[in-house]
Amino acid sequence: MLFCGVDWASEHHDVCLVGEDGTVRWRGRIAHDPDGIQHLQAAIARYEPDAAAVAVGIETSRGLLVAALVEAGYLVYPINPKAAERFRDRRKPAGGKHDRLDAEVLAQAVRTDRASLRALLPDSAVATEIATLARSPRTCARAHAPAEPVALRAG
């Protein structure tokens, strides 16, 4: 089994792959785009070609990256940020947040505490379509919003 931790961010993600013995196998940073996802999947496949034998810890339960990982067959475990903070305190009690360390902490968390975490299940086609439709108005509104706020005047 291979364990992957992803420190999620809006522009890029820090990633750490850990073996069953807790040894770091690979660290990297991927872009938050389809090429970044392909890069991550290629890195994982070098160490474990069977997606079902890969557990991924990440601090979000949605988004392009999560959907792609679930669809590819990886076991994706969303970890609450507060829980991730506690896992971080276990590994390094003093110190601030570091993306590389956080990626390793998430990988180690799914390695040691996976039994207490809940993996995401793939969405049905209907659920995916509903989620897409629900996001569409927000996406559309953001795309057409003025660059500066418009002041309303009583008149």
What residues fall within each predicted segment?
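Phosphate- and other anionic-substrate recognition elements at nucleic-acid/protein interfaces
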Residues: 1-155
